Amino acid sequence: MLKILGILLCCVLSLPAQAEERPRLIPPGWTQTVADRETRTRKFVSPDGQASLTARQVSADAGAANRGLDRVAYRDGEQVTYHRRAPSWVAVSGYRDGNIFYRKINLACHGTRWNFVELEYPRDMKRAMDTTVTHIARGMTRYYDDCGR
């Protein structure tokens, strides 16, 4: 009986740790096509090859966290239809070259690093990609305290 109670106690105590695990942001079945250690950039492509996800990291100046954020959030030739910004992140979405793009940039590693994620996919994939975009956007906020690779 004590053995069973001990096992149950261990299971209960491990629940918060499991709940705080970082979410996997790369969708299942996507293939990595680029891994550049120098620029800390990785690119993934959907199984059908129509959608892509690019992720990269750059150092952040803790004293000027917001300086220059708009410069990296916006690009020429894009029609922005969605923009949200907070002190530690910015999200931009819209159309570019006939495709939909979604870009989110947020502070990570206790404010010492910017994490960038950008998805691009055809307009007709919007409904299919909505869940993926939402999962990635929400999941990125869980990396603020993470200083891993």
For the regions a language model picked out, list residue spans one by one:
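Surface-exposed amphipathic alpha-helical segments
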Residues: 22-32, 117-149
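Secreted/luminal cysteine- and crosslink-motif detector
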Residues: 11-12, 110, 148
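Secreted/extracellular small peptides and ectodomain modules produced from precursors
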Residues: 8-9, 107, 145
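Hydrophobic h-region of N-terminal signal peptides that target proteins for export
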Residues: 5-18
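Generic secondary-structure transition motif, activating predominantly at the C-termini of alpha-helices
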Residues: 13, 70-77, 137, 141
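Conserved polar/disulfide-associated segments of primarily extracytoplasmic proteins
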Residues: 32-116, 121-127
